[in-house]
A protein has these predicted regions:
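Conserved acyl-donor/pantetheine-binding loop and adjacent beta-alpha core of acyl/acetyltransferases
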Residues: 28, 35-90, 98, 146-151
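Conserved GNAT-fold acetyl-CoA-binding loop/helix
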Residues: 13-38
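Conserved N-terminal entry element of GNAT/NAT acetyltransferase domains
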Residues: 1-22, 163-165
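Conserved acetyl-CoA-binding loop-helix of GNAT-fold acetyltransferases
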Residues: 90-93, 99-112, 134
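Long, low-complexity, intrinsically disordered N-terminal extensions of eukaryotic proteins, enriched
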Residues: 84-87, 161-165
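Charged, low-complexity C-terminal accessory regions
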Residues: 147-164
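Conserved GNAT acetyl-CoA-binding A-motif
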Residues: 112-125
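Conserved active-site alpha-helix within GNAT-family acetyltransferase domains
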Residues: 125-149
């Protein structure tokens, strides 16, 4: 089922009900974040876009180190963490709301929530590059290991998109 009209959307914080968001995630993602959430919930905040009926999209903003970082994220993310960039992880759009700009609306809502903040994130699917680039993120690093491809993106609040060398 594809929902064509969205009348009302709200950005909501899920402080005490993380499972509501975790349940919409792919099973692999649930296994990654679920077991460690208790240990990192003070460092992360779940934001969801919802209408009156359900969660349409959501993600987690980490103000410090995200959990379960890969070696690529550890090495390349350190300078951004040191500069106070927030990490965006687990951005997911529900199947009924895909191709309706919900991911872009979620990112825009987060940028509006933190107007003076810069962000970083990583992707493991190259097909997502265009999505993040059209939302103002710049690719600043690419893993050299073909068995575990990853790309790091940054969004700077001043829109300069510089690369830390």
């Amino acid at each position: 089922m594809v929902v064509n009209k969205i009348d009302w959307v709200e950005l909501k914080v899920l402080k005490n009900e993380p499972d509501i968001f975790f349940r919409i995630l792919p099973e692999e993602w649930q296994k990654t974040i679920g077991p460690v959430w208790e240990d990192c919930k003070e460092n992360g905040c779940i934001y969801v876009l919802r209408n009156a009926a359900e969660i349409m999209a959501g993600g987690i903003v980490f103000i410090e180190e995200p959990p379960n970082r890969t070696q690529f994220e550890i090495e390349n993310g350190a300078p951004y963490l040191a500069l106070g960039y927030y990490y965006i992880g687990f951005l997911f759009v529900g199947p009924n709301y895909r191709n309706q700009s919900m991911g872009s609306k979620w990112l825009e809502a987060i940028k509006n929530k933190y107007p003076d903040r810069s962000f970083w994130l990583t992707i493991e699917e190259e097909g997502l590059r265009y999505f993040y680039e059209k939302n103002g993120f710049k690719c600043v690093a690419e893993s050299q290991d073909p068995s575990t491809p990853e790309w790091m993106f940054v969004y700077t609040s001043d829109q300069k998109g510089f690369k830390i060398v």
